[in-house]
Amino acid sequence: MKVGIIGAMQQEVAILKEAMTNAQTVNKAGCTFYSGQINGVEVVLLQSGIGKVAAAIGTTILLDEYQPDMVLNTGSAGGFDSSLNLGDVVISTEVRHHDADVTAFGYEMGQMAGQPAAFLADEKLMNLAEKALEQMDGQHAVRGLICTGDAFVCTAERQAFIRQHFPSVIAVEMEASAIAQTCYQFKVPFVVVRAISDVADKESPMSFEEFLPLAAKSSSEMVFKMLELLK
């Protein structure tokens, strides 16, 4: 069994990389691939770079060349669910693009031509994430729709647009839908497990940059627990 793990930024993969044994590093097409073992599980850790194009390029190489049996997308996200606070975890049930619009041709908002409106996370991996969560005392999590776009959502106007078209959204970020679409086309199961670094409509004494290391720690701990359960 081989697990693909994807994070966009160095801060989002650093803790996982440090835990790897027998690690080998390959740089290709602007992406960095670390292959080795974490807690006895064979993994390939991808630092893809930020945004949907970078994520799609990296995920394609990961799936084609390393052929993992499953993909976990980790890192940070912006919270949209009112129950979320900084450091909480979100687990995807489905993933959608929030910045795609070909509704003029009869598609749903967020649906790309020739693609499903939503990319569904794997049920077994969602349940695995829930079991991992049970072993993390005090860690709050919400399960639901995660939306992706090539923009850092920080204006009230954009937040309102996303809420209008995707009323069940729990979090937004910048890579997951590209990863999900690539996994869908390769027929590889995936789940997104991210930690909240900022929350819409809630003031925080910490900036995104200040909280990112803590979000990375929370999401990495979830991945560690999931890998332990896979052994």
Curated annotation (Swiss-Prot):
<comment type="similarity">
    <text>Belongs to the PNP/UDP phosphorylase family. MtnN subfamily.</text>
</comment>
<dbReference type="Pfam" id="PF01048">
    <property type="entry name" value="PNP_UDP_1"/>
</dbReference>
<protein>
    <recommendedName>
        <fullName>5'-methylthioadenosine/S-adenosylhomocysteine nucleosidase</fullName>
        <ecNumber>3.2.2.9</ecNumber>
    </recommendedName>
</protein>
<feature type="active site" description="Proton donor">
    <location>
        <position position="198"/>
    </location>
</feature>
<keyword id="KW-0028">Amino-acid biosynthesis</keyword>
<feature type="binding site">
    <location>
        <position position="78"/>
    </location>
    <ligand>
        <name>substrate</name>
    </ligand>
</feature>
<dbReference type="GO" id="GO:0009164">
    <property type="term" value="P:nucleoside catabolic process"/>
</dbReference>
<dbReference type="InterPro" id="IPR035994">
    <property type="entry name" value="Nucleoside_phosphorylase_sf"/>
</dbReference>
<feature type="binding site">
    <location>
        <position position="153"/>
    </location>
    <ligand>
        <name>substrate</name>
    </ligand>
</feature>
<comment type="pathway">
    <text>Amino-acid biosynthesis; L-methionine biosynthesis via salvage pathway; S-methyl-5-thio-alpha-D-ribose 1-phosphate from S-methyl-5'-thioadenosine (hydrolase route): step 1/2.</text>
</comment>
<keyword id="KW-0378">Hydrolase</keyword>
<comment type="function">
    <text>Catalyzes the irreversible cleavage of the glycosidic bond in both 5'-methylthioadenosine (MTA) and S-adenosylhomocysteine (SAH/AdoHcy) to adenine and the corresponding thioribose, 5'-methylthioribose and S-ribosylhomocysteine, respectively. Also cleaves 5'-deoxyadenosine, a toxic by-product of radical S-adenosylmethionine (SAM) enzymes, into 5-deoxyribose and adenine.</text>
</comment>
<dbReference type="InterPro" id="IPR000845">
    <property type="entry name" value="Nucleoside_phosphorylase_d"/>
</dbReference>
<feature type="active site" description="Proton acceptor">
    <location>
        <position position="12"/>
    </location>
</feature>
<dbReference type="GO" id="GO:0019284">
    <property type="term" value="P:L-methionine salvage from S-adenosylmethionine"/>
</dbReference>
<dbReference type="InterPro" id="IPR010049">
    <property type="entry name" value="MTA_SAH_Nsdase"/>
</dbReference>
<dbReference type="GO" id="GO:0019509">
    <property type="term" value="P:L-methionine salvage from methylthioadenosine"/>
</dbReference>
<dbReference type="GO" id="GO:0008782">
    <property type="term" value="F:adenosylhomocysteine nucleosidase activity"/>
</dbReference>
<keyword id="KW-0486">Methionine biosynthesis</keyword>
<dbReference type="GO" id="GO:0008930">
    <property type="term" value="F:methylthioadenosine nucleosidase activity"/>
</dbReference>
<feature type="binding site">
    <location>
        <begin position="174"/>
        <end position="175"/>
    </location>
    <ligand>
        <name>substrate</name>
    </ligand>
</feature>
<dbReference type="GO" id="GO:0005829">
    <property type="term" value="C:cytosol"/>
</dbReference>
